[in-house]
Amino acid sequence: MQTIVLEAERRMPGKKSDLKQLRANGNVPATLYHKGEPSISLSVKEQSLRKVIYTTESHIINLRFTDGTEKPSVMKDYQFNPLTDSITHADFQLLKSDEYVEVEVPILFTGNPVGVVKGGMVQATLHKLEIRCLPSDMPEHITVDISSMDMGESLHVGELSSKIQEKIEFTVLTDSHAPVISVLAPRVVADAAPVAPEA
């Protein structure tokens, strides 16, 4: 699991006008929380935060404060302004090495399905899995081998255990009946054109 360092500044919980000024300066108000502990109000640079959000992998985020302290965390939520697309807030959860954490991890499909070789098409319906694991076992992604899937076959969350390549310990929290990926038969292009009557 790759660790990303994100520079952060502590802040006092402020009024709406204070938050507006913070955002105008290119910063995003955020909160770092952990069950049973006081939350920490902070801010991070929006440009740096975007690089964390727009990634295809999961990461542990080390929040590095101006006093030199670092807090390992995962980002649990973020909000956008629907009009400007700017990031308006982010929530981080503090990680403890001996405590399990629930995270969403991207699914990486590998292999060329048998059904595709026969002319079928792959349709993925689930792109992330929600799992529970220790921080040391948190994967950047979960690799699923789909090479044995034939035309007309579907794979559900409950059937993934034999397909996952990562040798780590985690519990899948996503509904076991949720469809993940299917190999569909090719669509009929069009009905045959009617034959014109002879003159």
Curated annotation (Swiss-Prot):
Keywords: Ribonucleoprotein, Ribosomal protein, RNA-binding, rRNA-binding. CDD domains: Ribosomal_L25_TL5_CTC (cd00495). One of its GO terms (biological process) is translation. One of its GO terms (molecular function) is structural constituent of ribosome. It comes from the Bacteria. Pfam families: Ribosomal_L25p, Ribosomal_TL5_C. One of its GO terms (cellular component) is cytosolic large ribosomal subunit. InterPro entries: Rbsml_bL25/Gln-tRNA_synth_N (IPR020056), Ribosomal_bL25/Gln-tRNA_synth (IPR011035), Ribosomal_bL25_b-dom (IPR020057), Ribosomal_bL25_C (IPR037121), Ribosomal_bL25_long (IPR001021), Ribosomal_L25_dom (IPR029751), Ribosomal_uL5_bac-type (IPR020930). NCBIfam families: bL25_bact_ctc (TIGR00731), PRK05618.3-2 (NF004136). This is one of the proteins that binds to the 5S RNA in the ribosome where it forms part of the central protuberance. Part of the 50S ribosomal subunit; part of the 5S rRNA/L5/L18/L25 subcomplex. Contacts the 5S rRNA. Binds to the 5S rRNA independently of L5 and L18. Belongs to the bacterial ribosomal protein bL25 family. CTC subfamily. This is Large ribosomal subunit protein bL25. The gene is rplY.
